[in-house]
């Protein structure tokens, strides 16, 4: 299926996971406008990478990592047809292999060549990851890989974010609310902390079904606080953002976030 936004076009016909409202909301919500380097983990059709390119300055470079070959090809085609083809690099790889390749490259760099080696750290990391931890798998292996965590468990995702995020960087992901507890254990074990979280309801008045997490590195002070006082590092959650009101229209915050992307806003 094809989707036309205000500044770019997405064809996701070869992708296991189609463009979704969740993805558009994540791309619009993430506070990445000042980033100079962005990593999109599990890029799929390239939606988040293209939204990041639209929202950042011209000197921001974006890397889109996608495991599935067909999706990576679709992502590359969508990037090539966008205004930002020179700013987005598509890599057909797992994030685990990408981390290993960067580590191998770093080990081969001496002090004389370090200055010209591309940075392996990113100001911002964004991901709409596979998040179903159990339940029936899709009949399509590609769709199963895109939806279920067996290829990218939370531990691997958050360890990759920990490894690739710059010291003052920020990462934003979206998950089902039922995955929040296991995700929290995984990001804390990886050495990350919650900067903010936002619950998402599909309709005004309904219980949240998704949660957006903003993560950053633990500081030395955070570690001492946790060890010494046993206090939670998680701030209080904000009120839920609802996608549609009871009349089926976009809620005011949703409309404000997405007005630069959706044609009819």
Swiss-Prot record:
Top-level taxon: Bacteria
Keywords: Cytoplasm, Methyltransferase, S-adenosyl-L-methionine, Transferase, tRNA processing
Record keyword Glycosyltransferase present: no
Catalytic reaction(s) noted: adenosine(37) in tRNA1(Val) + S-adenosyl-L-methionine = N(6)-methyladenosine(37) in tRNA1(Val) + S-adenosyl-L-homocysteine + H(+)
One GO CC term, this protein: cytoplasm
Annotated EC: 2.1.1.223
Cellular location(s): Cytoplasm
InterPro entries: DNA_methylase_N6_adenine_CS (IPR002052), rRNA_Ade_Mease_Trfase_CS (IPR020596), SAM-dependent_MTases_sf (IPR029063), SAM_O-MeTrfase (IPR002935), tRNA_Adenine-N(6)_MTase (IPR050210), tRNA_adenine-N6_MeTrfase (IPR022882)
Pfam families: Methyltransf_3
Coiled-coil region list: none
GO terms, biological process: tRNA processing
MF-aspect GO terms: nucleic acid binding; O-methyltransferase activity; rRNA (adenine-N6,N6-)-dimethyltransferase activity; tRNA (adenine-N6)-methyltransferase activity
Function: Specifically methylates the adenine in position 37 of tRNA(1)(Val) (anticodon cmo5UAC).
Protein family per UniProt: Belongs to the methyltransferase superfamily. tRNA (adenine-N(6)-)-methyltransferase family.
HAMAP family listed in its UniProt record: tRNA_methyltr_YfiC
Protein name: tRNA1(Val) (adenine(37)-N6)-methyltransferase
């Amino acid at each position: 299926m094809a989707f036309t936004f205000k500044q770019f076009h997405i064809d996701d016909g070869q992708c296991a996971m189609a463009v979704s409202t969740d993805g558009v909301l994540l791309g619009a919500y993430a506070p990445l406008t000042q980033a100079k380097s962005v990593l999109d983990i599990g890029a799929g059709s390239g939606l988040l990478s293209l939204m990041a390119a639209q929202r950042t300055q011209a000197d921001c470079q974006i890397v889109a990592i996608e495991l599935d070959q067909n999706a990576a090809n679709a992502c590359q085609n969508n990037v090539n047809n966008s205004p930002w083809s020179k700013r987005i690099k598509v890599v057909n790889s797992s994030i685990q292999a990408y981390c290993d390749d960067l580590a191998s490259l770093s080990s081969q760099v001496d002090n004389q060549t370090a200055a010209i080696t591309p940075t392996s750290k990113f100001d911002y990391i964004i991901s709409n990851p596979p998040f179903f931890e159990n339940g029936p798998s899709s009949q399509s292996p590609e769709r199963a890989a895109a939806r279920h965590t067996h290829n990218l468990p939370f531990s691997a995702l958050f360890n990759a974010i920990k490894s690739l995020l710059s010291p003052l960087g920020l990462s934003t992901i979206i998950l089902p609310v039922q995955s929040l507890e296991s995700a929290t254990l995984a990001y804390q074990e990886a050495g990350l902390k919650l900067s903010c979280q936002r619950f998402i309801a599909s309709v005004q008045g309904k219980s949240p079904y998704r949660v957006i997490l903003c993560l950053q590195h633990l500081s030395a002070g955070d570690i001492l606080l946790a060890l010494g006082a046993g206090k939670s590092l998680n701030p209080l959650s904000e009120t839920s953002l609802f996608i549609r009101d009871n009349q089926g229209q976009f809620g005011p915050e949703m409309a404000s976030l997405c007005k630069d992307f959706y044609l009819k806003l």
